Amino acid sequence: MSFSNAPISFPGLFGDWQFTVPSKALNIGSGIYWYGIIIAAGMLLGLYFCMKQAHKYGLSEDNVIDTVLWAIPLSVIGARIYYVLFYLDLFRNSDGSINWSSTYRIWDGGLAIYGGVIAGFLTAYLFSRRRKISFWALTDCCVQGLFIGQAIGRWGNFMNREAFGAATELPWRMRLWTSTTTYMDVHPTFLYESLWNVIGLLLLYFIVSRARRFDGENTCFYFIWYGLGRFWIEGLRTDSLYLFHWTLFGQRIRVSQALSLVMVLVCAGILVYQFKVKKADGSNLFVKRVQQTTEAEEAAAEPTAPDEKQ
């Protein structure tokens, strides 16, 4: 059932007041959608924030800009491919063949964040190798912008009336009207995830990043924090992507929950290894190595005073 342009209300918070926000911002050509505008705004704000943080990680603003300018389009492509692969039945014609023309209509919604993250991190890895900079320092800087982009981008789902949760009677439930007399009360999961990302950003910026002891620590925190939140929120949603037709204990396996669990376990293992085995203390951070190299080059470039005549 499509809820595009359906009236919205929050009866537990605002009573009978309802409002309608069109999914299209401008009717130019096939239309300019709020979904795309909001996602683009999130990306740009995330990029700006990362640029201003770059020096703290031994990076230049150009490093961040060049990485993100490549990562953004490739991440969108990755997010769409991921969504299409796991929701392939939605893109089939009545005879079972794939309707290829519908696979690229991203303005109608249908981007899977994990596909975008995978593509973005692969781009960052290739870029870091080419520029000879630390991949983990680069991702430590960029995950801050990723939190920002996701927190803002989830409001694109709100504009499309998608990615909501199961029926609920909680006070903050969101009501989607299908007619003047029929409606659905659901979990506003887009809001849950947006707030979860905002909290993650605050914890990362004010606590984790200021006590960073190894390159990759911010990245591990991002995957653990986002993974825990996504595992919980995904269980509330009704439009989950499933791992083909595989089941566990009689239940179909949700792709995002499976990936979230793997991410949390792997990154928790990395933290234990770094702190307990390698005894990471921050002395080998990329930013410190860059500072030491710069100081050595400046010292070598200083003119040597001529010997005094005897």
Predicted stretch roles:
Residues M1-Q310:
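A feature for loop-to-transmembrane-helix boundaries and adjacent hydrophobic helices
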